[in-house]
């Protein structure tokens, strides 16, 4: 199935799986989704992910979700920039999520990264979504 917004699809799959206390969830594979998952893994919001190749030639990403005391680690995950309304931020205007307790995930010229990494690299970009 084709999707017009793969990032929103990924976020929705993660949110729905955590509401049902699933340990794993799969999503169609792409390089952008893998880069987003790498940021979530490095920030400690998911346990990990793996690329699974099917005999038909398509790949899927299998995501291991993370829980703490039976509660999902990701409390809120919200899409900011959408295909119909892109949201960009310079390095000076990068949003802080819940006073720095959460992160914003950005697409920058240097790749997909968390907001604090973008501040360190002194780059702005498209604010994809926020996580708390």
Curated annotation (Swiss-Prot):
Part of the 30S ribosomal subunit. Contacts proteins S5 and S12. Belongs to the universal ribosomal protein uS8 family. One of its GO terms (cellular component) is ribonucleoprotein complex. The gene is rpsH. Pfam families: Ribosomal_S8. It comes from the Bacteria. One of its GO terms (molecular function) is structural constituent of ribosome. One of the primary rRNA binding proteins, it binds directly to 16S rRNA central domain where it helps coordinate assembly of the platform of the 30S subunit. Keywords: Ribonucleoprotein, Ribosomal protein, RNA-binding, rRNA-binding. GO terms for biological process: translation. This is Small ribosomal subunit protein uS8.
């Amino acid at each position: 199935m084709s999707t017009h917004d793969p990032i929103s699809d990924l976020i929705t799959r993660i949110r729905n799986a955590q509401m049902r206390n699933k340990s794993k969830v799969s999503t169609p594979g792409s390089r952008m989704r893998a880069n987003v998952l790498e940021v979530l893994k490095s920030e400690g919001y998911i346990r990990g992910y793996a690329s699974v190749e099917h005999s038909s030639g398509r790949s899927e990403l299998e995501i291991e979700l993370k829980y703490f005391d039976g509660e999902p680690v990701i409390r809120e995950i919200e899409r900011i920039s959408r295909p119909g309304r892109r949201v960009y931020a310079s390095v000076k205007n990068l949003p802080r999520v819940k006073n720095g307790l959460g992160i914003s995930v950005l697409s920058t010229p240097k790749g997909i990264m968390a907001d604090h990494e973008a501040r360190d690299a002194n780059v702005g970009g498209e604010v994809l979504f926020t996580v708390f």
